[in-house]
Amino acid sequence: MVSVTRRSLLLGVGTSAAAAAALALGGCSLGQAPTRIRMACGEQGGTYVQFGELLRDALTRAGTTGLEVVTTGGSVANLELLKHRDAELAIVLADAAATDAQNKVAIGRVYQNYLQCFVRRGGPIGGLEDFPGRRISIGAPQSGAALTARRVLTALGLLDGADAVEVSELYLDEAMTALETNAVDAIFWSGGLPLPAVQSLETEVELVDLTSALPALEVDHPGMYTLAAVPASTYGSAESVRAIGVSNYLLARPDLPDDVAEALVDVLIGDAAQLVPEGSLGVQYLTASNLIDTSPIALHPAAQRRYRQLYG
């Protein structure tokens, strides 16, 4: 596994675009699957990396192509890696992907993310009414969580004006430490259920219901966000908590070889049960009818053909 930081991204990861592409696809003749492809995922301790590792293992079992899991800040960083040819695949939140639907294609819609806002149980925040003036980490720099959280806070009138919160962008490990040490009052995270890093916290946490932002979000971003629920006991709560859901897309560069795109479709459908992290409670989209719903991002032509071959 390799890690890409904002600094290394801005420096081009030490290679030109052409050299990066040659490295990833080196040793392959035209029409053959590359020996290894790179998938931009997310932060250690999050569900993007979990999914990337499971997909890597599934491709290894299938004997089709190797996959290198790249840790990043999240969706926005992943889009930059695709754009600059420093990754062949990326997992990206649908709202982040929709900010620029060009120069990328989709392999499929894979699972639902839940925008989660964690606070200390018994702390100063019991609900949204306690947010004004509080210190909030909205997610890592260049993460999809930060993008979605800013939209939610804007919809709630908490990003500007007299009720504005104090915003910071912390990586997951930093955010967890800050929450435990009272350096922040709440942290946002967008991911599957449960968030693995929460389970190792010594501090008890609970979720804040953010769904009063949904009507305003629907006006500004129609069809992008849905009402979801975090099941009871996910984080020790006796009751389920309403949440904001947004889809995740597995994206690729348009020049991803056809046979690789087809192999990915085969694994997503044929090995679906092995692509769900152990203990996962969230919504999965690993069926043909759900995988193909990647609007406004077009499916990779070879992936689309493969779905049709398999399911008409």
Predicted regions: what is each one?
Residues 2, 8-27:
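N-terminal export signals
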Residues 29-31:
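Bacterial signal peptide processing site
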Residues 34, 64, 77, 102, ...:
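Extracytoplasmic
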Residues 34-62, 113-181, 293, 297-302:
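Bilobed "Venus flytrap"/periplasmic-binding protein-like clamshell domains
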Residues 52, 68-105, 173-179, 193-201:
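Pocket-flanking alpha-helical
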Residues 94-97, 160-251, 255-256:
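Pocket-lining segment of extracytoplasmic ligand-binding domains
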Residues 102-110, 136-137, 233-242:
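A structural signal for short loop-to-beta-strand junctions that line the ligand-binding cleft
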Residues 241-312:
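Segments of small-molecule ligand-sensing domains
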